[in-house]
Amino acid sequence: MAAPNLASTPAPEFRGRIYDSILDTVGATPLVRIKRLQAEYGVKADILAKLEFFNPLSSVKDRIGLAMIEALEADGTIGPDTVLVEPTSGNTGIALAFVAAAKGYKLILTMPESMSIERRKMLKLLGADIRLTPAANGMKGAIAAAEEILAEIPGSVMPQQFKNAANPAVHRRTTAEEIWLDTDGGADILISGVGTGGTLTGVGEVLKLSLIHISEPTILR
């Protein structure tokens, strides 16, 4: 059987690139029409899903993990020997672990012992040092433990996802711009889950500046 002539097969636009780092593959996630949902409910508008699981570690948090660490690098807060410390129970920890591994930083994560074995294994595979706290203490216990570690290790730094301005900023700079460009400025409604609020804040601010008809709903049903 003759080998296929791959050279004659049209390649998707995203092929033919070789990246210098896995970090360069964060973002630029696709928008996809959810046609079956539109048909099922008789919706005339396009329903689009932004596939953030196309990020390297399958989460929108990859954006903020990279953004927070690079912001700390840019302002000189961290250097090659800096130890990063963060309390986390979610995908931000995985994102920070992935970025820290790619850049060579030591990362200590504190989290309640109730977190799944799968999550712990993933973090360990990425090289993170995991410190478990009593489940009964919840995230407050993890935060307290992280603060104790910061006090013990000179020069250690906490990215602080809930307070870090790089969180919403990266969504203004990337996520919002991607949505705007991919829809030719035609986005009318944005629906987003809320954790730290970074995605909704960053994207919402940009769309509200660009589209005067966009506003927060006054009634939630």
Description of each model-found segment:
Residues 1-216, 221:
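PLP-dependent amino-acid enzyme catalytic core
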